[in-house]
Curated annotation (Swiss-Prot):
May be involved in the metabolism of insect hormones and in the breakdown of synthetic insecticides. GO terms for molecular function: heme binding; iron ion binding; monooxygenase activity; oxidoreductase activity, acting on paired donors, with incorporation or reduction of molecular oxygen. It comes from the Eukaryota. The lineage of its organism: Eukaryota, Metazoa, Ecdysozoa, Arthropoda, Hexapoda. This is Probable cytochrome P450 6v1.
Amino acid sequence: MVYSTNILLAIVTILTGVFIWSRRTYVYWQRRRVKFVQPTHLLGNLSRVLRLEESFALQLRRFYFDERFRNEPVVGIYLFHQPALLIRDLQLVRTVLVEDFVSFSNRFAKCDGRSDKMGALSLFLAKQPEWREIRTRLAPAFAGAKLKQMFSLMEEIGCDLEWYLKRLTRDLRRGDAERGAIVSIKDVCDLYNTDMIASIAFGLRSYSLRNTQSEIGSHCQDLFRPNVRRIIDLFVIFYLPKLVPLLRPKLFTEPHAEFLRRVIQLVIEERERGGDLRNDLIEMLLTLKKEADLQQDKSHFTHHRDFLAAQAASFEVAGIETCSASMSFALYELAKQPLMQSRLRREIREAFASNPNGRLTYEAVARMEFLDMVVEETLRKYPIVPLLERECTPINKKRFYSLRPHAECYTRRGMPVFISNLAIHHDPKYWPDPDRFDPERFSAANKALQAPMSYMPFGAGPRNCIGMQIGLLQIKLGLVYFLHQHRVEICDRTVERIQFDAKFALLASEQRIYLKVDCL
């Protein structure tokens, strides 16, 4: 009896302690007179995210537009017990991402270098000072001159896309000249972007557009296919980084990591034996390897066997899903607006005709103004990376960083801050009638009127997307070769309005986007 009473007393004491600790934790913003979203005990503001009712990015958008915070520069939130800030003021956004980058130079997300070296060395999640060195070493590969050199490789994949569409529409139109091909447009874009990244990042031709069962394509699909373990791993990495050393999640699954190691090693060995010289990103990785071999400090992180594979994995993550989704959303909007699609097609055909041999050139793509406008408006309405996050890292070992004069509060060392570029891109204050797809927003005259920091599909500041230019070129070439000889139309299976997937961290359609594709 006494034993049972002691157990009961211990349980009550523990629960009481947890309750008191929880109450004290959740008055953090209240004590600092910062308006905040009311948390749920133990879960903070993540209860809907944990129930898969709403992605974290969609939740931040909802908080951003909450009437209670209309005039607030910042909003307090909680990741379980961790206080965090949602930034609403654009000048404060500039301060965090650009002007005082040194105080917010790391991402909050984390991989443990002991259990997941590939994740920790990837450019996306690397911490200072490793991040700065990796970024500096990779930057030359993404310069404009390098893009021009890679253009012929990218054009090959564009031609494969056009061939694929011709075969697709020919096979499905037999016996019915008016029918066309009803396709899941994202699936087609996935094949194109898989081939593109395989070529320019891995130095391989995967031929996904000619053989949809390619090995590279299969591994890439597995990377983005959600399952329970993958969801848990990513949740811990991005929202519970303090538990990363204990739970040891991996940014890339072990089978995929091993596949990347094998592919990179084989390609590098072939290049070192005097294989074909290609102006691709693998040449840059080979240069990094040679530089590392010359260093006397063999313990330097560039000597780790996963360093090169980690960078290739970064190219893969950044170049397949994001570009595929962007292309899909652009084609969806163009299918709903045939006149806009026709205007773009005229520009595309003029670009081909500008070259005597009828081939597309890098310079011709650079001159396509309406294509630029369509892509930029797509990325405004559908920013595939819908939020930006940083960790407070004050300099000189300070514990706090003041947000004055923009907000009457401060962030403490290690605190995450979030910026909802999805919400900013849909704020009527900056973008009138934000749900309307209107490329004219990005005409030369209208771009001059845009509020600074109101358009950030690739982030901003020193830690913006290093592959922005190559990603834009990849999307543009995909649209050019898709619409050059084909048109897209809505059909009975086309969704009337895009609903975003609550289970996906990136911006993705909950339903498949079906469009009718036909030859011209």
